[in-house]
Amino acid sequence: MTVEEMAKAMKMASPIMAASSTETRNNALLAIAKALNEKKEEIIIANNKDLEQAKEDGLRDSVLKRLKFNEEKIDGVIKGINDLVTLGDPLSKVQLKKELDSDLVLTRISCPIGVIGVIFESRPDALVQISTLCIKSGNSVILKGGREAANTNKALFEIIKEAAVSVGIPADSLFLVQAREDIQRLLACHEYVDLLIPRGSNEFVQYIMNNTKIPVMGHADGICHIYADKELDTDMAVKIIIDSKTQYTAVCNATETLLVHKDVAPALLPKLNQAFKEKNVLVKGTEDVKGIIDCEDATEEDFKTEYLDLIISVKLVSSVREAIDHINKYGSHHTDCIITTNDETAYEFEKFVDSAGVYRNCSTRFADGYRYGFGAEVGISTGKLHARGPVGLEGLVTYKYILEGNGNIVDDYVNGKRSFNFKEL
């Protein structure tokens, strides 16, 4: 079956998927969780093949970290699925109800987007999260994973599809494509695909946007910042910065740049640098930073770089305004944090930083659908339309207007025979 034939079949199955009951969709999730638990060994064998090939190909350690899908990660996605089951049904929610006239009622209800195409990177857990979120939200999904995870993705997809179909999910609501050239074919399916979600670099997202007529929800790279203000708790700052940089480096919500107020730098940087050394973090600093701690030179390009590694760029600033300007210029509008004890400074930062997530006194690693209580996420949207930040269930639904009348015609209202009352219900 070609990609176009897949997409066409999905479009036809989409209304059936949208009309599936809450019970059917939740049962599918439970069946998937059970199947993943029972077939861990099969998944790990497939993943080991991918890891061996990736090492032979000389892929970076950050890619290998993302690619690894061991028992711990499988247990993590199973827990995520079970948590997703407990969340409310995002479909058929009444968002607005208004009586336009005594026998003319307008209702706005949530409904699935339809057919979603997701192009994602080398993380196998992304396939599980995306497919289960789409099932829960009544969407059909066509998946294209990174070639590095081909064996793992194939094993996971077959397990997920078999389990979902066994409890009544339409077989044509889930498809996986593997070939690189399938991306171009998917981009041409604007008649059948309602939304594309590419996960990758800014360049990749821009390429997708420029080569398709399908609406795109962009998941960009993560050049996340922390600004350490002149008024702060030093111990708290060190704890937050170390977690943001080192808790897991190969992800888009890890901090890549640290901005430090010049007045607090002499007290903070030596203490922080010691903690960085203990975690094997390579520090790149501007000249004024190098005057306080021993580190490598930071270039202009470093402040535009998503390292996904144990590397951080450090710069001194003279005010919160300078920090904000730097973030808005060099950041990717993903997640940025201020560490401060001054409420007014924090409010200024929260108001003027133009990012999907703006944090105060907490790790940037919290930028995640699961940690927001969304169950999981299909990605982080840095755009401003429809969904922004971690895209969970609510970001995968749209709405429709239901208007119920009793022989009402517009001419009666134009000619004054009847009038609207616009009463909220």
Annotate each predicted stretch with a short phrase.
Residues 22-23, 91, 167-174, 247-254, ...:
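Flexible, glycine/charged-enriched surface loops at secondary-structure junctions
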Residues 1-106:
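N-terminal Rossmann-like NAD(P)+-binding subdomain of aldehyde/semialdehyde dehydrogenases
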Residues 86, 95-231, 235:
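Rossmann-like NAD(P) dinucleotide-binding subdomain of oxidoreductase/dehydrogenase enzymes
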Residues 18-19, 230, 316, 339:
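A structural signal for short, well-ordered beta-strand elements
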Residues 299-425:
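Conserved C-terminal structural/oligomerization subdomain of aldehyde/semialdehyde dehydrogenase
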Residues 122-125, 129-137, 155, 159, ...:
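ALDH superfamily catalytic-core signature
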